[in-house]
Amino acid sequence: MTTPASRHMPPDIHRTAVNGGDVRYLRAGSGTPVVFVHTLRTQLEMFLQVIEQLDTTQVEVIAIDLPGHGESTAPPVDYTAGYFTDAVEGLLAHLDLHKAVFVGESIGASIGLILAARGNPRIAHVVAVNPYDYGRWGGARRSSPLNNVVFTTILWPVLGPIVARAGTPGLLRLVLAGGLHDRHKLPPGLAGDIARCGRLPGHARAFRSLCLQWRSWLSARAQYGAITLPVTLVYGDEDWSRPAERDANARDIPGAHLVTLKATGHFASLETPKEIAALIQAPD
């Protein structure tokens, strides 16, 4: 049966067991593997506009729904940066990828940088778009007054679980708009797809657990100095991170190539897909 999410998707959708859960991923094309990993409370559809810019006769696209996101299952675990990184590492091994370009956005970017710091042999280059490694109680609080309320109260007892479940399409459109320079760049139907997937078993608990583990994303920065892989560090000029935080990452990651995208917020994959695709095809 065609689901609201899958009706927008190419037919190359797969599922596999990874680290105690079932992970949905898109796999299409042939050539250099390019792995896409999204951010919190979103899913692989975030990258469809970027994927459309790529020549899949030259690259093999793998886009992942993280555990507890999209149509992947939500195991009853603590959703730390380490847990997500282990899950993605397990999928890379399962797919037996080699010399992959890793494209991550927000927490997806942080996952890519942690994998690079671990010296994961399956990755050749990381394109880290707006890594999520800053902000007391979570960087998303900086995005708008509404999101400050949402991402603060989700941490509270009693109210937190209620907020985690309150993902109507209308509310999610407002939340996502906090990550965009131009809110008209939000694709029609995306908020509805995310809302539907957020109602799947365990997903609200996973979302709140991820938010409660905000310190694990900040502490990941201590690992960046161990990175030896090439890294393209990409920031929207209107990202939630502060210029000093971006400069610190550029200094801490050996040899990082820093790129700033104009008129771009946190969700660069939605606002500037052509520019992201160009960095993938010519990362240096």
Annotate each PLM feature.
Residues 19, 26, 62-107, 117, ...:
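Active-site loop/oxyanion-hole signature of alpha/beta-hydrolase fold enzymes
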Residues 137-141, 163-225:
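Conserved alpha/beta-hydrolase catalytic His-Asp/Glu region
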Residues 109-120, 126:
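Short glycine-enriched nucleophile-adjacent loop
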Residues 117, 125-159:
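Flexible "cap/lid" loop of the alpha/beta hydrolase fold
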Residues 54, 226-264:
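Conserved loop-alpha-helix segment in the C-terminal half of the alpha/beta-hydrolase fold
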Residues 21-71:
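Conserved HGGG/HGGXW glycine-rich cap/lid loop of the alpha/beta-hydrolase fold
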Residues 264-277:
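Catalytic histidine-centered segment of alpha/beta-hydrolase-like enzymes
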Residues 1-35, 56-59, 97-98, 181, ...:
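Alpha/beta-hydrolase fold catalytic core
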